[in-house]
Design a protein with these regions (language model features):
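Catalytic core of pol beta-like nucleotidyltransferases
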Residues: 1-26, 34-40, 51-105
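Short beta-strand->loop micro-motif that forms the acidic, two-metal-ion catalytic signature
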Residues: 44-49
Length: 105
């Protein structure tokens, strides 16, 4: 999959840049869309690594605003997960999946 050609991913990245600016260390698409085995109605799973995050709930609220705006305009379902910068280097099954299948936005 060419993630640059997906307008939803472009919109997600632009919204992250507008909301967080340089605070985003990485934004990683994972799940079925990253593996290129998604159905047309599959959601977009995005891990957002933040250099200086507020609480998990505050960041989840900010990301929910982005998710809702895009859902309202396009019908695309986005599940964005806020994570502290550097967590992608931690050993866990989830981080192994991100390393194996993830696509940086």
């Amino acid at each position: 999959m060419d993630i640059l050609s997906d307008p939803i991913l472009g919109r997600i990245r632009a919204a992250l840049d507008k909301t967080y600016g340089a605070n985003v260390e990485r934004a990683v698409l994972f799940g079925s869309r990253a593996r290129a085995d998604a159905r047309p109605d599959s959601d977009y799973d995005i891990a957002v690594f933040l250099k200086e995050p507020d609480s998990f709930w505050q960041e989840s609220g900010r990301l929910a605003e982005i998710e809702t705006d895009i859902l309202y305009d396009t019908g695309a379902v986005i599940n964005a997960l806020p994570l502290k910068a550097g967590r992608h280097r931690e050993p866990s099954a989830f981080m192994e999946e991100l390393t194996r299948d993830g696509r940086d936005l």
